[in-house]
Each structure stands twice: as structure tokens, then as C-alpha cells.
Amino acid sequence: MPRKKEQASKSENEKQTSNVQAQDFKTAIQPDTATAQLIKTYSNPKQRGDKGEIVYDGGQSSKLAEVVDQTTEPHNADGAVKDGRIAPVKLDLEKQKLDKLKLFEASPFDPLTVKNNQDVVDKLYATQSSSIQEVVPTKTFATELQFGVTSEDMAKIYGAVVAVSKNVNSSVTYEVKRGTHELIKVPTIPHNLVLIQSDNGKHALIKEDLGQWPVETGVSLVNQAGVFAVQLANKLGIDKPFVLDAGSNYFTDTSFIDTRKYCTDGLSPREIQKALNRQRAYYDRPELTIAENRTLLSQSIVYPDVDGNDVSVIFSGAMSHAIFTYAQSQWSKNIIRLDDYIREITLTVPKHYRPRRFKEIEHTHGYVYRELNQGSLLPLVDANLKEASSYYFKKLMPSISNVPVDARTLQSATSALAADTGLVDRAPHVSMLTNRLTTANASSVRAITVLTCMFKQFRIGMTYSPDPNIMDVAAATCMLLFRPAQSISDEQYRYCLQTMAVFLTNTTYDIVNNDTVDVLKTKLRNQGWPLVERYNAIEVDMSVEPLRSPGQVGRYYNPFNIDPLTKKHVEDRLEEFPNQVQVGRFRNVSNNAVGAALAAFLRACRDKTSANWKGYSILVSRYRSLIPNELFESLRNISGEYNINPQDEHSFFFALAQINADEEFTGVIDKESAEYLDEYATLAREISNSLTLVKAAFGPLERTSGSILNHANNLNKVINRVFADKPLISETMLKILTIDGTTGKDGYRNWLDKLVGHNYPVYVEPVVNIVNFISARFIADSSYFGYTNEIMIMPNHITVPVDDRFGFRDSPFCMSLPRTIMGNEVRRISYSVFSMMEDIDEVISEGFILYDAYFNFTYDIMTTDGVTRLKEDILVVTDTGNDIKPIHFYIYFENKNDKKLRYESKMNVNYRLYIKTPACLLPLNDYMRAQHEYVSPSSSRVYIKDPAVVYTRS
């Protein structure tokens, strides 16, 4: 219950709030209102209400806004700067009365009900969803305002937005993410400690219980450790991005003046206090004094640290602490401030995008979890280059083909060409060029054009008529002149020159088949044909980094070989070349009919590309931003896969359409980025998993018949295991691996087979580091997890120096297994030798240490008095060999000097089993060794639930 002072304060605040609600509001929230002051003055983010609850009412539905007469708003039309936009829409909030505004006004921002800054942000958004906290924007429509409204309300709002945005560029929003995750808040610290005390209080210990993790001998311990590590990480809740939020888990002692905050996490000091008092009572000693109790209680506290962090000092397991804090450090590397995240991601989008608005409190205290590291896609692409290339090219083609264009009619293009050539004797050649014009395949040629500028190794082909005509020459010329050199193979280049030579010199392919490129170029120049070169396109640096290419510059080839600085073709003499062609005498005729027709065609294509290249350049850059640099460098198509018909080629450039990438289409490209990013992330994760699988399951492959057979068997086992329930891989990878017609199983098998022997780096992300850390501890500290690599069997009559710190009767634990006992060396026998021994009576009578195997053990610690024993005899002797049964101890405390139990201990046992003391056991008197620190980041932090940054083209 709150104290009187708190109740009075709360009552006063409620009175203030009710007074504020009676006011008449002109805007959604006024800076000088009592509510605004309350919002500004909340002080202690740790304070709660009586029950810590958040209460606010959804209210009654009412009209969200009404549009009033536009003429009521003054409009600047006569100033030095004239505003050409339609007068803005004014929202009349007077007519809303207080229905919606009361919700915002009554939102519980009283300091006593605010838990932390996250709570404040949640309440701000909750209020905003049912009232107008922000006036409808003029350019950006925030969709979060739509919650709970009716279709009629939506019609009015959209009508207002449309009216406001007339004569203004419309806006589109989309989400851009870079490996972002929602952080899991861990509210309490897992300590995994159990305090065990004998019935009479004489003995007590603290045990860290992480569960039993049985291992198998003959199977790689590293691999088993990895499996257990994943399970343990999941059990501890650290396998996903998390943040510790335990700074408010404390209480204060009101019985005396004390400002300390006593932590409620971990093993309770009260339990330790009770155990110590029981132990003191057994020895007839007084209980802990008040001062000693306070000292013990103060061993588990919460205190503030730098940057507003809270340090919780608690009693917890040493292994739990090591694993938890390591995992915390790994995930925290990727937790950054919201503003830093915005700056990072702003570099990855076009300059004309801007981040959406966040609350001021989010900018001040906001944090985001993001992964900066990126896994490589090359292990998949290198091994499946043809399939991966085919997949992505076919994925891009339909999208690019659908780009809106402002097409020029073929009739107008034909008329222009006829007017340029003029003379009647040129008409047949003009007709040959114009009659074959078509736009049927323009969209696919346009898509191929974009792909040639997007990829370094995208090659195109073209097959000409066996008896070339003027259209073939026009198409070949367009290919050499307007397509980047890297997209034209040497064979295709020579073929283009041959086609030109055959037509322009009026010869046949047989005559020029053996001519080299240089010979062909010389022939054409001598004939008066100057267009014989391929041209290296200008590489343009992108203003943003491509997806999954952090910190890297993305590049693409500027379309049509236009230099973006001069806005002209990279061939400086292109202005003169048509004039040279026009006067040429081709095909061994006396007139220039062929030259004039081709010159007019070239001028039209030159002018078209010079006028329209910008739209294509923007289109290329937008799609190129979807492609990681490593795919830009590596993807390549097979020869002949993307051939262009000469008719389509000459038609495309002659009637080149202007790109009309409107807001809707650009928005489609923007939204595709999220799909591509998610797909890349999925593939990278699966590649990393597959590499880990290969490295774990297959060692270096020796080229011997036995090893190859063993490798094949192991591969079959792996495939059958990972495809037993459902495929380990996603639909995307299945599509890539099955392009050549194989099944998913066979495709994955073939790929894994290719990965064996390659030293591809494994993408090390936080969860991999965490699993590796747990695996290493699992191997190094085996006794924590219930297995050991050596045990000792001794006859009952031999006295063994045991670990007596815990007060067990006939303890099976030794600080370390002795190498000598009573001056005699203890025999060591490997498990494999022991299993084949014919007679073990002698070794048992002398005692021995068994090693070279993994021995699983479990134990129950009984609080009553008794004789420590094994659940059953562990030695198994048969005609075929010897073995060790599962080891399970029943361990009893020695609570008193019991003669009967002492005799039972000596008389009924032939041999005893000893192991090294499990490191998870701690005597009660050493309880301070269980004290560990955990750091909770400042409770003033606000973790952005949806960290995707929305960008708006304005």
C-alpha cells in the first residue's frame, strides 16, 4: 500500500488532472497545460503505481477530423515567392469536443504510474492510436494513426491528404532493415543454485544444477558439445538477442534507516541465513546477530553504475554467471543508439529518402539491436554458379520488364526517319529498317539492357541472318555502340564485325570467316564505316551501399555508354560518324542510299539515348542496390541464354522509350528490397549452418578408397538426418539447388560434397560465439555437466583420501584422483583394454583408474543419515567382454556417529567407485565464492520494438 505522503501526492495530481480536463482545447496538446507539465516532470522511471498497472480507456468512437472551407486559411499568393500549391487543408479540432482529446489528457503520465521511459513511449503510442496527437501530415501519412478508425473516417482522412498534397510530390513509405531483431527482455537473473542441508543442520552445501548432459564415447566430443550447447543456451534463454532488465528487482528495508537496495534475484541470503543458523544451532552456537544478518543481506544488492547502469550483486552459479555474462556481452555488441542506427542505415538508401519521425524520448533514450556483420553468399554461388545466376537473373527480369515507359509510337519514328533520308532511291533501305520495327519484345530487351549494366559478367548474344541485310547491320551497330563492352564476348564482337563486313562490302561469310578482328576493322574503315569498336561503359559510384555490402561502394555501368558528366556518348566522334556514314558508298554501288539510311538511323538512336539515359540510369541504380557486391562480381549467365533478336535490338534503340518510374513503381522496387534482404539473410544463415555442418561432420578428405567410402556414408547419414522431419534449408535454397532438375535432397548432397575440403570462413555471429563458448566450457569443465574421462575403482578395505568438505559418509568424491595410495602407484587401464580383459578379479582386488572414455554419472544427495552407495553394481562381466553400467550415486550425509551405519559401510561393500569432485558443489561456508555481478543497462533506455526505419520520398 502506498504511504500517506504518496497517497496525498497522488490525490493532488488527480485533482490537477481533473481540472485540466475541464479546459477548452484548441490543439491536441498545449505546452502550458498541466498534462504537458506532468509529462515533462516525471522523475523516477523505477517508480510504479500501487500495483504497477497501466490503465487507460479506449473511449468512445467519434469523428477524427473534419475538413473546413479551404478559403479560411490565408494563402501566400502575392509575395516575392509565390506558393504554387493549393492552400493547405485546415483541420477543425473544435468540433471534436473533448471525446478524443480527453483520452490524451487522461493518459496516466503521473510519475507514480510511470515505470520507465519504455512505459512512457508505449503510452504515447497508445494515446496516439485513438486521438490526434499529430495533425495529419501534408506529405507523409503515418499509418499508425489508422488504428481503430472506421472506413468513413478513412475516406475523410485520405481525402484531406490528397487535397493537401496536390501540386506536391506524392509520398511513399517503405521499411529498410539491416539484420534487426526485437530484443527479449530478461526480467530475472537465472542463478541455478540449490541449497542442500542435512536434516539435523550439521552439514550444508550449495549446488549449481545445469541438468544432465550424457555424452557418448566413440562420437566426436566437440560435436556433442555443440548439440548440448545449443540446448543449454535455449534453456538459459540466451540463444536470442536479449537485454538484462533486472535493475528494479530490489526491496528496501523499512525497519531501520537504510538506503541500500537489496536484490531479490539469485539465491536468497535469507536461505543462507537460515542454513547458517541451523548449523550454529547444531553446534550450540548463537544465531547470527542483527549486525551479521545485515552484513549477509548486504551481500546481495543493486547499486547504480556509470551511464545509469544497474549492477546486481547476487549469489549465482559460477558456470551460469560465466555463460550468461558472455552471452550478454556478445549480444550487447550489436545494441546501438537509435540515432546511430538511423545514421548507419541512411547511408544505405538514396539521398532523397529521410527517416520517419520518432518521439523525442526515443531519440534521447532509444536503442536498437542490429547485426552489422554479414555472412558471405559465395560458398553457395561458387559451387552452384550456373544455378544461382539463373535464379537471380530470372527473378529480376519480370520486375524490370514491368517498368512504366512513355513509348514513342512507331509511326512517328518512321516518319522522322523518312523525312531525314529524303530521296526516293533510299526508300527501299528505309522501308527495310522501318517495316521490321516492333515493340512486342521491348520490355524484355529493356530488362536485359538493365542487367548488362548491373552485372560485371552478364553476356548477351545476337544471331544474324546468313544473308545479312541493313537491319542486321543496324542491330550489330547498336550492340557495339550502346552496350557496355563487358557484356559483349570476343566471339560476339567478331561476329558483329563479320556481319557488317558481309553486308557493307557485299560479300559472304565464307570470305571473311578467317579474318581477324583487326583485319575486319581495317576492311570496314577502308569502306568508309567508322563504327567498329566496343566501348567500355563509365562505372558510376552509387550514393548508397548495396544490400549486404556494409561499408562498400556499389558500382554500375551507365546505360548506353553515356558519360554522365558530359551527358554524351563516350565516343567523342559520334557527332561526326553519321556524317561519314552518310557519304559512304556501300555494297559496291555508286550512290549513298545505304549510307544515308544508316546515318539517319544512327542519328535517331544517338539522340534517343542522349535524351533518355537518365531514366535508365536511375532504374539501373535502384535495382543494382538490391544486389550485394559479391553477386555483382560473380554472377554470370551461360552462353546463349540471353540472346536478342536483331529485329528487337534495332527497334528498341530506334524507338527508345523514356522510363516513367512513377511513385507507385518506385515504391514496388523499394518494397522488394525487404524481400531481397530477408532472402539474402536466410541464405547466409543456411550457408553458415551448412559450413558448420561440413566442418563438424567431415574432416580433411584423404584420397583413399576407405576414406572416400567413409565420406560417402557420412554424407548419406547427414542428408537423411537433416531431411528426416523437414528440410534444413529454405525454399529459396531449394529452388537454386533444384534448377537443373535434381531433387532437393540430391541438390543439397551435391553441394555439401563440393564444400568438403574447401576452407570457406564460417560466418561468426553472436549466437555462434555463444555456442562455441558453452561448448568449450562443456569440454573443459566436464564435471559441471555430469561426465568425466576417468574413474577409480578401489577395494573397500583400501583407504582413499576423499574430499571431506561436505560431510558425506563414504564420500565418492576426491579433489583429484590419486596417482599413488599408501605408497603404491595406482594402475591405469584404458577403457578399450579393460573391455577386452578376460580376468578382472586381480585388477579389482588391487584397484585401478579407468580412463580413455566418457563416463556419465548422476547422483542424489540425501539429507538423511545413511551409507553412500551405488544404485547398482556397475561392473558387467560377460564371455564377450567387460563394461561399466550407468553410474548413479545415492550420497548421504554423516549426521551422527552411527555404529550400525559404520559397520554396514565396511561389511556390505566389496569395492567403491570414486570420481573427481563435481565443480558445481560448494560448501556452505564458502558461500561468498558464489557471489557474482550482473549489469543491467539503464532502465531509462527505450528499446525500439520495430526498429525498421521508414523512409519517405518527399
Curated annotation (Swiss-Prot):
Residues 16-29 have a biased composition (Polar residues). The keyword DNA damage does not apply. InterPro entries: Seadorna_VP2. One of its GO terms (cellular component) is viral inner capsid. Keywords: Capsid protein, Inner capsid protein, Virion. Residues 1-29 are annotated as: Disordered. It is found in: Virion. Its main location: virion. Residues 1-15 have a biased composition (Basic and acidic residues). Self-assembles to form an icosahedral capsid with a pseudo T=2 symmetry, about 60 nm in diameter, and consisting of 120 VP2 subunits. NCBIfam families: seadorna_VP2. This is Major inner capsid protein VP2. It comes from Banna virus.
